[in-house]
From Swiss-Prot:
First and last residue of the signal peptide: none
This protein's name: Large ribosomal subunit protein bL20
Record-linked Pfam families: Ribosomal_L20
UniProt organism field: Gloeobacter violaceus (strain ATCC 29082 / PCC 7421)
Source taxonomy: Bacteria, Bacillati, Cyanobacteriota, Cyanophyceae, Gloeobacterales
Gene coding for it: rplT
Role this protein plays: Binds directly to 23S ribosomal RNA and is necessary for the in vitro assembly process of the 50S ribosomal subunit. It is not involved in the protein synthesizing functions of that subunit.
Record's GO cellular component terms: cytosolic large ribosomal subunit
Domain of life of the source: Bacteria
UniProt record, GO biological process: ribosomal large subunit assembly; translation
Gene3D superfamilies (UniProt xref): 6.10.160.10, Ribosomal protein L20 (1.10.1900.20)
Length: 119
């Protein structure tokens, strides 16, 4: 029976992992077993944090909107409620951008939200 030689396949597999581990410290970028564990952990964390990043940014936007809304005499929830009632189609990312870069425009949006809510 013919012998199966796996030298090229095994080398390619190991080189792929070591290439992914480039920049890791110490044996985590030099030795295959340690590098393989660290690469798997890094990929798992990257997958997990791509999802938490979305939650973190939404929280940041809400904090920024709330801070600017309170200078206009509204709470965050009342601002959002007023915008929904006024059919203003601005999402939280846009509102946060306005709050940071253009407070005058945000004040106008807050005025629209105030007028849409009954007192």
């Amino acid at each position: 029976m013919v012998r199966v030689k796996r030298g090229n396949v095994a080398r390619k597999r190991r080189k792929k992992i070591l290439k992914l581990a480039k920049g890791f410290r110490g044996s985590h970028s030099k030795l295959f077993t340690a590098a393989n564990q660290q690469v798997m952990k890094a990929l798992r964390n990257a997958y997990r944090h791509r999802r938490t990043k979305k939650r973190d940014f939404r929280s940041l936007w809400i904090v920024r909107i709330n801070a600017q809304a309170r200078t206009e005499g509204l709470s965050y929830s009342r601002l959002i409620d007023g915008l929904h009632k006024a059919d203003v189609a601005l999402n939280r990312k846009m509102l946060a951008q306005l709050a940071v870069t253009d407070p005058e425009a945000f004040a106008e949006v807050a005025r629209v939200a105030k007028s849409a809510r009954p007192v």
